[in-house]
Amino acid sequence: MSHNFHVIIPARYHSSRFPGKLLQEINGITVIERVYRQALLAEPKSVIIATDHDEIADRAIQFGAEVVITSHTHQTGTDRIAEVVAKGSFAPDDVIVNVQGDEPFIRPKLIQQVACSLTKTKAPVSTLCWPISSLEILNNPNVVKVVCTRDNHALYFSRSAIPYHRDNKSAYSNTFRHIGLYAYRAAFLLEFVSWPPCTLEQIECLEQLRILWSGFSIRVDEACEEPLQDINTKEDLILAQQYFLDISNI
C-alpha cells in the first residue's frame, strides 16, 4: 500500500566534513542504498535520488533507484530536490519529503509522520523534533535547537541553547533538537528556493529561517520514535557500522 507522498533524497558527493560518505559501506551496502531502502519501507508513491555525481548515480541505478541528475551548483539539498520537482510532473499540492542521504537508519515511521503532519496543517512545511537529553547536546552548535508555539509551530531555530535557562544553567528540560526531515507542498518548495537568503539564515547557517523570516509557518511535531544518528564524519560511520552489528546480533 503506497501513501500519498513522494520522497526525494538529495545525494551530494563532496561533503565538507566527509567527502564520498554516501558511497561508504555498512556491512557491504552503501549508505545511500540503505537510505533508499528505508525510504521504500515508508511506502511513498515514489522515491527519487537527486545527485550531480556520476558514481552515485551509477550505483543508485544499479540498485534499482530512480535517479534525476541535477546541477552541480546547488548550495543546499533543498535546492537540489526543488530542481527535481521543477523537472517533474508533480501537482502543486503534492507532498514532497526531503530525506537526507546520510541517514542509513532513518525510521520509516518518521517519514510517514512528517508527511501525514503536513496534510493536517495549514503550514506549507512540516518537520520533527526530539527532546534533548543532556547539557552537552544542548550546548553543541552542530545540534540545531527549536522552540515552538503552544500549537506546535516553530518560533525559532538556532545553534545556540534555546530556551536559555537563566536561573539554572545546567538545566535542559523543555528543550528540543530539530530533526532535519521536512515535508513540503510542491508549489511552496519551488517558491521557497526562489527567495534570496535572509540575514538570520546567513548568521546561523540554517535555511529554514528563511521561511519564518518571510512570514510563513513551519509545523513541528515531536517524533513518534527516537531518531538515529546520521553520518557526518568518519567516526559516525564507524559508530553506524557497529550499530548495525549490534542490531544484527539481537
UniProtKB/Swiss-Prot annotation:
SUPFAM superfamilies hit by this protein: Nucleotide-diphospho-sugar transferases (SSF53448)
UniProt KW Nucleotidyltransferase keyword: yes
EC number: 2.7.7.38
GO BP terms in the entry: CMP-keto-3-deoxy-D-manno-octulosonic acid biosynthetic process; lipopolysaccharide biosynthetic process
This protein's GO CC annotations: cytosol
Catalytic reaction equation(s): 3-deoxy-alpha-D-manno-oct-2-ulosonate + CTP = CMP-3-deoxy-beta-D-manno-octulosonate + diphosphate
Pathway: Nucleotide-sugar biosynthesis; CMP-3-deoxy-D-manno-octulosonate biosynthesis; CMP-3-deoxy-D-manno-octulosonate from 3-deoxy-D-manno-octulosonate and CTP: step 1/1; Bacterial outer membrane biogenesis; lipopolysaccharide biosynthesis
Chief place where the protein resides: cytoplasm
Matches recorded under InterPro entries: Cytidylyl_trans, KdsB, Nucleotide-diphossugar_trans
Compartment annotation: Cytoplasm
GO MF term list: 3-deoxy-manno-octulosonate cytidylyltransferase activity
Role summary: Activates KDO (a required 8-carbon sugar) for incorporation into bacterial lipopolysaccharide in Gram-negative bacteria.
Listed name of the protein: 3-deoxy-manno-octulosonate cytidylyltransferase
